[in-house]
Amino acid sequence: GIYGKTKREAEIKLLEIGYHSGMHVSIVRPSLVYGPGVKGNLQLMQAGIESGWFPPLPEVNNRRSMIHVDDLVQALILVAEDDRANGEIYIATDGESYSSRQIYEAFCSVVNKAIPQWSVPKVIFDIVSLMSSRMRYKVNKLLGDECYSSKKLQSLGFKAQRSLREMNETDF
């Protein structure tokens, strides 16, 4: 879409400015960030699970990349300090991938809610996605794939210290 296109154009411009000025410029694209102070869809999911209105997600075997905010900070420091990173683009993940159901279950555990043994059937989400392009977008954000490789970042020596499986109540 237009957002992705303009973001990419801005990245290219920044890299060009860095190259021509001799300034160290690197781009870090974080995957879905979780941890203290993080806002957005994960915060909404957590609040919905806590209050009991978030639907139990089906296991659709999708894959999503994530990174803890503390690990993202370490990745940013590494890229800023390592001369090899100059002029490069990196993707920051914890190196694992999770299904939306696994994310849902991790949040249930963090807020001390029993993990339901049932889920809303995927066909219900499929029907909802037919209602409008906005609903299709929301369902895809929830159940679609967003899985990326951080091998390039790892080549600088980055290794995430946290994973979603170790998430606890101090992460929110």
Q: What residues fall within each predicted segment?
A:
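Active-site Tyr-X1-5-Lys
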Residues: 1-26
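C-terminal amphipathic/interface module of NAD(P)-dependent oxidoreductases
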Residues: 137-172
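The catalytic Tyr-centered alpha-helix of NAD(P)H-dependent dehydrogenases
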Residues: 2-6, 30, 65-69
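Amphipathic alpha-helical segment in the mid-to-C-terminal domain
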Residues: 69, 100, 160-161
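Alpha-helical membrane-targeting segments
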Residues: 44-69, 114-147
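Flexible, glycine-rich beta-alpha linker
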Residues: 23-43
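Mid/C-terminal beta-alpha module of Rossmann-like enzyme folds, strongest
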Residues: 78, 82-138, 169-172
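Substrate-positioning beta->alpha
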Residues: 38-44, 58-80, 87-88
